[in-house]
Amino acid sequence: MTSHPANRISITRRTARWSDDDVTIADAMDLWGFAAGAANVIMQLSSPGVGYGVVESTVDSGNLLKHPWKRARTTLSYLAVAILGNAEDRAAFRDAVDTAHRQVRSGPASPVQYNAFDRDLQMWVAACLFVGLEDVYQLLRGQMTDTQAEQFYRSAATLGTTLQVQEQQWPPTRADFDSYWDNACAQVHMDDVVREYLRDLVDLRMINPLLRIPFRPLLKFLTAGFLAPVFRDAVGFGWGRGRQRLFEWLFLAVAFGNRFLPVFIRQGGSYLLLADVRRRVAADKALI
């Protein structure tokens, strides 16, 4: 079984498969993952509870538009801990996130009811992270066999269970995940408030104009390319065959060059972030 075409990106040209070896989600911790970062934020916030939870959050230190680099570090550190870390790393990060999440809940005037401890919302965020990692991995390393896809998926549950998602909540098979994903995507909705917030993000309104002007067109292109039609339509981004071809050719070239990069370059950043988390824990410093 596969997801509905509107709910996943469609790639007609991709690099040849590197190998038939066993795989895990850790193999997806590649430096090129940053290219899909903004798209994944859009995916997550397209669930109304997550969208308003972020837009209305009073946790100023985690505000993406006010502290973009700090927020990026927190998200990337979470991925490093969830995928590469051990049980102690995950417990420490869970405590830090729980402290911040206690302040994130809807108020009387909120148009959507939400609570950051809602396991269904956390499952959605974890699912978006998984889909983003799977998309980037297959663009860089080629399409997985059915067996590899199942291995990859089964190793990814810690994306959710590092926080409040229960093991039994994570769909047991890749086919079950596709069913979950299609049902969840049917609930995608974005109003003007969340849409404007996300457009400000992609327009890089929060960074220095000297960086914004040259990088904004590339970010918009990459973000739209990594969005499935259901999300692209929700946020109002245009796309066409020409852009799709350019996106595919770009990642064919990136994938070719990526083959020659040693693992410590492709994945070293994630291990440095994990080491930083451990250093902060040892020094009793804040993680987020």
Where are these regions (language model features)?
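Mature, function-bearing regions of proteins
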Residues: 1-288
